[in-house]
Amino acid sequence: MKRRSFMTSVLLTLYPSLNFGQSLIPIADAHNHLGVLRRNDERIPILGQLMRDSGISLLSWTIVPDGPFLGLRGGGITQVRPANSGDFKASYDRQMGQILGGLKVNGVKVLKNVEDLLESAKGAPYVCLTSEGADFLEGNLDSLEDAYEQGIRHIQLIHYVKNPVGDIQTERPEHGGLTSFGKELVGALNQKGILVDLAHSTSESISHALEISKTPIIWSHSYISNTTSSWNSSGFRSRLLSLKDAKRIADSGGAVGLWALGPSFGVGLGGGIDGYASEIIRMVNLIGAEHVMFGSDQDGLPQGAVINQLSDLRKVVESLSTKGLDEKTIRAIAFENYARCLKTAMQNRKS
């Protein structure tokens, strides 16, 4: 028996409610830091095994260039160390080096084209190399093509540090949305065939990006709320995505990922998997099944996470099935929506 068929058989035995004609639903996570944020993390060399064991075939493996400069202050994450010119690029290079070194031994391939997406949909483990924040560009586009050649196919415009790209949700706004460079960057990402991610952006920045982008844009990780927030809202509330903005992203053909921070959607640690699945269903009812995806933020949440290992996402898929969602809907949420946005972005590359 081929290894892929064997693993499918094992997973269907573990999760019998997923037996849709003996086809295992592939899973993608649009925002995951597994092993990246610590030096020499022991999970990096075995990432391929972890993905195969849980049936995760597409992982947005996410670098955080501003990570070494962040800390907790006043109940939220903010910049606590100054950065000099070149520091963010050096941080990016270090993390990228760790990832590329791990890929030499863990049996996972880097997603680079539509053909790779098709293989991933069949169950082969791939990572989409992602940068959370364009800080590593240091305010110019000179190194963007180099990042593309390394395998970057997904860039989140901003993160937690003040930057030349645009305003962030958690700091007092200074630019009224995206800067001129930020607008130029959105266009450049379109031309390079790199997916644009608006997580951590303000509503004004969302407006600017949607006006410019020729391809669908995503919001990889957070939660949708009927309320609004401001930069000085407490804790995770400053990171919410308003329903109005979520609908605008969906109307453009994009998708919104749900992070694993249970308290943000009223779920304690005890109700983790089922609570996450219930929140996914709520999002489906708000913006449509074709615009909802997983964006766990594994290893990126300081506390309160209800998804702590890759196999938890397989349990979420099982919970969605138990709660009555049909196979087509689950496939869209679990894999196809993120894959569709990536495919459209990659196909838009101008040589």
Stretches found by the model and what they are:
Residues 222:
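Ligand/cofactor pocket segment of small-molecule handling proteins
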Residues 150-195, 200-202:
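Metal-dependent enolase-superfamily TIM-barrel catalytic cores that perform enediolate-based chemistry
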Residues 188-209, 243-251:
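Substrate-binding cleft of carbohydrate-active enzyme catalytic domains
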Residues 152-154, 194, 212-218, 252-255:
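Glycine-enriched alpha-helix->loop->beta-strand junction motifs that scaffold or abut catalytic
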Residues 212-215, 225, 348:
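A short linear boundary/processing microfeature
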Residues 5-173, 227-229, 235-294, 298-351:
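N-terminal hydrophobic targeting/anchoring segments and the immediately downstream early-domain regions
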